Amino acid sequence: MEEGVVGGGGAAVLVALLVTVVLAVMRSAGSRSSKRGRLPPSPMALPIIGHLHLIRPPPHRAFDRILARHGPLVYLRLGPSTHCVVIGSADVARDFLKFEASIPERPPTAVTRQLAYGKAGFAFAPYGAYWRFVKRLCMSELLGPRTVELLRPVRAAELADVLRAAQSAAERGEGVDMSHELVRMANNSIMRMVASALPGEMAEAARDCAKQVAELVGAFNAEDFVAVCRGWDLQGIGRRTNEVHARFDALLETIIEAKEEARRRSLRLGRRESSSKDLLDMLMDAAEDDTAEVKLTRDNIKAFVLDIFTAGSDTTATTVEWMLAELVNHPECMAKLRGELDAVVGRSRLVGEQDVARLPYLQAVLKETLRLRPPAVFAQRVTVEPVQVRGYTIPTDTQVFFNIFSIGRDATYWDQPLHFRPDRFLPDGAGATVDPKGQHPQLMPFGSGRRACPGMGLAMQAVPAFLAALVQCFDWAPPPSQPLPLDMEEAAGLVSARKHPLLLLPTPRIQPLPSFYS
């Protein structure tokens, strides 16, 4: 009897203590909430993991589902302490971009810290003197109009290899893996623009490294969201990152040493001319400039080359592949583009980058593909101070995801947003004045503002020309075993590529191919 009384008293004390703790936690949470202000709508979170269980790959699709249910601005907690907001409409994106000074940087991850030599590169460099210097270097020299034009023959030569591969496949009556051919073309083009005298075996090694870099950067890594996982490498991502970084670093060191020797030899012979410079030459010139406001280090050069190679090659190949796949699925659009090419360019010569400005339907196909199938499906920033937007307070150190995939399908701006309709971008279409270079939030495949992709000028010139040549020279159809429409499922990763290889049968339209490419 006495034991029952004592036990009952102990239970009462325990309950009282638990109630006190719960009330204290609630008061503390309320106090923190009042300090940080009102947050955007949010799905129900789980203890510890927050909303991680909702982010199934590919993440842009998961974000899109959440946005469809909770509105165009959503708060998520990924893990115990990683706070995020996701933007899914052009209007909300426009409101956020008014506070660009408050979201100037990209949040680094465990993988990018290692691969990008800390923050030595351009993509993840903090906003400041170094970032501004490299941005100017990019826009005026490395990826400026003069350099893009100067390196046009490099891109033309790589396109020639793709056309020859398609011609050979057609002669054998076989299909061609366009996914493989386009990745090879884009990677080789970028690497030869970076270092013109690159041996074939180095290009192959660089291509393999770039593929693994894209996989690692795009992979979910628990260490980025759950602090107790840091240092344990439970997924093996850290080990793989170290291995890829070591391989890429050794490759870059070999390329740089070869370039240094070539520059010394040219200088001795008096052959050093600006017209023959590639991007690596330009970076080395900047590093050797004693009057420059920022001194580039060897790690800066390596990180920058890595940025250009990984960002430029996969996105180029992916965009051309999506364009070609959409045209195969929409024969009426393919016929319209082919008619434009025949009328403007003809069949006596190959269409080139210089023709793009005179081909409005080609430009419309590119814009519609970038709207519906953006290769970079979200842009990521982090707040450096609280941001007041739409009645909500976004706290400092909150990751901001512009879900470009959802924004491009915003029904407020686009009629039938899930349909492939290039005509919307023709002069009499609703999107005639919409430009994809970041001025119109409803179409921002290259991001917007100071962190927009510096290579957009190159992309807008080279990508449509690649596609135009393929359409001008060949008819394309899937193998008999693969009926239309083509499967358009996306793969998870840093770049939103097609999940399955694009296998097509080419039939020559121009025989022989134009002499410049024969």
Swiss-Prot record:
UniProt subcellular location: Membrane
Bilayer topology annotation: Single-pass membrane protein
Family of the protein in this entry: Belongs to the cytochrome P450 family.
TM segment ranges: 5-25
EC number from the UniProt entry: 1.14.14.162
GO cellular component: membrane
Pfam families to which the protein is assigned, alphabetical: p450
Binding, heme: C453
Metabolic or biological pathway, per its Swiss-Prot or TrEMBL entry: Secondary metabolite biosynthesis; flavonoid biosynthesis
Keyword terms: Flavonoid biosynthesis, Heme, Iron, Membrane, Metal-binding, Monooxygenase, Oxidoreductase, Transmembrane, Transmembrane helix
Gene Ontology MF, one: oxidoreductase activity, acting on paired donors, with incorporation or reduction of molecular oxygen, reduced flavin or flavoprotein as one donor, and incorporation of one atom of oxygen
Cofactor: heme
Single biological process term from Gene Ontology: flavonoid biosynthetic process
The name this protein goes by in its record: Cytochrome P450 93G2
Role according to the record: Functions as a flavanone 2-hydroxylase that catalyzes the direct conversion of flavanones to 2-hydroxyflavanones. In vitro, can convert naringenin and eriodictyol to the corresponding 2-hydroxyflavanones. Generates 2-hydroxyflavanone substrates for C-glycosylflavone biosynthesis by the glycosyltransferase CGT.
EC category name: oxidoreductase
Domain of life according to the entry: Eukaryota
InterPro entries hit by this protein: Cyt_P450, Cyt_P450_CS, Cyt_P450_E_grp-I, Cyt_P450_sf
Catalysed reactions, as listed in the record: a flavanone + reduced [NADPH--hemoprotein reductase] + O2 = a 2-hydroxyflavanone + oxidized [NADPH--hemoprotein reductase] + H2O + H(+); (2S)-naringenin + reduced [NADPH--hemoprotein reductase] + O2 = (2S)-2-hydroxynaringenin + oxidized [NADPH--hemoprotein reductase] + H2O + H(+); (S)-eriodictyol + reduced [NADPH--hemoprotein reductase] + O2 = (2S)-2-hydroxyeriodictyol + oxidized [NADPH--hemoprotein reductase] + H2O + H(+)
Cysteine pairs bridged by disulfides in the record: none
